Amino acid sequence: MIVLDASVVVELLTNGALAASIRRDLAARSDSLIVPHLLDVEVVSAIRRLLAGARIDAHRCAQLLAGLAALPAERYPHTPLLERIWDLRHNFTAYDAAYIALAEATGAALYTCDEKMRGGHHATVVVFRA
């Protein structure tokens, strides 16, 4: 299994600079994809920022939202992870800790574009960067 965080999903949806590398890696592994329910809200927030910054238009927003809805990842509730999310509070935001806690609980690798997600926990982290 692979946990995708919001940075990776935004890269994939927007076909960002790292999207091809992420797709190649995912295709080579053929693992199932999992995400905390939080992912959808975080990605919608990122899409909103892209629109507010005039980097995309309303039509593109609709396309990205449809792509998010179609993301072939199983959504996991974060309620069972709350204790671990809290334990990680000294090094991570609750948002980041939700992805880490899910990866730890399932033994999945965590895919991210955020270097700060490395270390301070027991999850395996794969960081994509330019």
Language-model features: locations:
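Active-site neighborhoods of divalent-metal-dependent phosphate/nucleic-acid chemistry enzymes
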Residues: 71-113
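Active-site-proximal, substrate-binding regions of enzyme catalytic domains
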Residues: 46-72
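Short, flexible helix/strand-to-coil boundary loops that buttress conserved ligand/catalytic motifs
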Residues: 13, 47, 121-122
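Short, well-structured N-terminal submotif of metal-dependent ribonuclease cores
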Residues: 1-38, 50-59, 115
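Acidic, PIN/NYN-like endoribonuclease modules and their adjacent C-terminal/linker elements
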Residues: 1, 100-130
